[in-house]
């Protein structure tokens, strides 16, 4: 499968797509930089993502000899071929009608079977990727670059938003959002992280323009709905983790808009209650869609199962253990400090067992030093 997923044409077309997309980015930068000097970072950030997408492809093709991004593209090819054979079935599958009848059409067309068919979250990436098969000329690296290109819009919006909220820190935000190696590496390939990170950025941007500084409401409501839908469809726990933070953000700005301290004290509790009510309403509305993350008990159980899976012997030294989870809220809270440390700053240098992990450890060491400095 690895040998069939790419040809010499991939490496011939990659520079062509790189140049075309970069020139398009330079064109956008040239048009908008006069109105917003922050666009001076636009083309460079795009170039970083495009190069990262190529690097990710090479690493998964030649170092790991496989990976989800290859599986997603492989399955998306089947879906794209179905477009020419039976457009009705293709569009049904595109809108997530993964029925036995539709699968049988793939089988009877010698396209059996797309991977991840039974995994709704993973198959969402396959469905999205199928839209890029024709524009990429059925080219793995080119499709990855198009994925990176489309995802960049939300990321750059987050960069603009943070600079609006905290002016004078554009270089630091550029490093953190546009140039950080792990961010562009895992956010520039045909992967769940590419879509969910971009959606999280778009959701942050749209919430700001809906609730905090209302602007172009129809467009931003549509963006918020689409971003939320994709987050829930791919990684619902991100939406669950995002919701409290967004609620606090909205409540904080609403309270701070009240200039009189006395009125702020009087009205503040009502705004807080309204915010909690809104978060509760949204959580209950999406409860069924959140599945294993639709309640605290389900989320804890999912965390225990995932943790036990990731510490299996099959992973060897490529994982680290934060200790036993007993499935209780108290037990989860007791692991909070070590889990945060592991999530933000591991692997440490002494955890590295291969070149890729060493690169990640070097970046994490830099982040830890910056954290301690601040």
Language-model features and meaning:
Residues 60-75, 84-107, 116-128, 333-337, ...:
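Extracytoplasmic catalytic/substrate-binding loops of multi-pass membrane glycan-assembly enzymes
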Residues 1-16, 269, 346-374:
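Membrane-interface anchor segments at the N-terminal boundary of transmembrane helices
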Residues 20-28, 131, 142-165, 369-373:
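Transmembrane-helix motifs of polytopic, lipid-linked glycan transferases
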Residues 184-185, 219-242:
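Membrane-interface alpha helices of multi-pass inner-membrane proteins
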Residues 189-196:
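Short acidic/glycine- and proline-prone juxtamembrane loop motifs at membrane-interface regions
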Residues 166, 203-219:
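Membrane-interface transmembrane helices that cradle and orient dolichyl/undecaprenyl
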Residues 2, 103-146, 345-355:
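Juxtamembrane segments of multi-pass membrane glycosylation machinery
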Residues 232-362:
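Alpha-helical transmembrane segments and terminal signal-anchor/GPI-anchor hydrophobic tails
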């Amino acid at each position: 499968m690895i040998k069939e997923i790419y040809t010499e044409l991939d490496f011939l077309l990659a520079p062509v797509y790189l140049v075309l997309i970069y020139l398009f980015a330079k064109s956008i930068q040239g048009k908008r930089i006069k109105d917003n000097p922050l666009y001076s970072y636009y083309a460079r950030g795009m170039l970083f993502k495009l190069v990262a997408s190529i690097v990710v492809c090479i690493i998964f093709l030649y170092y790991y000899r496989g990976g989800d991004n290859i599986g997603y593209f492989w399955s998306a090819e089947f879906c794209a071929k179905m477009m020419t054979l039976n457009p009705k079935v293709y569009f049904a599958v595109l809108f997530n009608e993964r029925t036995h009848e539709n699968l049988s059409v793939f089988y009877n067309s010698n396209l059996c079977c797309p991977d991840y068919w039974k995994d709704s979250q993973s198959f969402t990436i396959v469905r999205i990727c199928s839209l890029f098969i024709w524009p990429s000329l059925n080219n793995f690296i080119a499709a990855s670059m198009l994925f990176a290109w489309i995802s960049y819009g939300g990321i750059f919006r987050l960069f603009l938003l943070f600079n609006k909220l905290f002016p004078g820190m554009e270089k630091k935000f550029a490093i953190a959002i546009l140039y950080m190696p792990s961010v562009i590496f895992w956010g520039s390939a045909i992967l769940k992280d590419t879509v969910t990170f971009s959606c999280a950025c778009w959701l942050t941007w749209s919430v700001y323009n809906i609730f905090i500084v209302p602007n172009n409401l129809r467009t931003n409501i549509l963006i918020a709905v689409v971003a939320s839908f994709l987050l829930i469809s791919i990684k619902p726990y991100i939406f669950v983790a995002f919701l409290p933070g967004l609620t606090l953000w909205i409540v904080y700005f609403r309270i701070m808009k009240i200039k009189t301290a006395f009125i702020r004290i009087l009205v503040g509790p009502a705004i807080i209650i309204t915010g909690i009510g809104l978060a509760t309403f949204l959580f209950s509305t999406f409860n069924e869609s959140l599945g294993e993350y639709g309640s605290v008990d389900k989320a804890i159980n999912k965390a225990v199962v995932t943790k036990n899976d990731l510490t299996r012997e099959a992973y060897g030294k490529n994982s680290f253990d934060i200790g036993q989870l007993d499935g209780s809220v108290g037990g989860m809270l007791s692991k909070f400090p070590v889990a945060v440390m592991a999530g933000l700053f591991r692997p440490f240098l002494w955890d590295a067992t291969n070149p890729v992990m060493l690169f990640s450890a070097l970046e994490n060491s830099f982040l830890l030093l910056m954290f301690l400095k601040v």
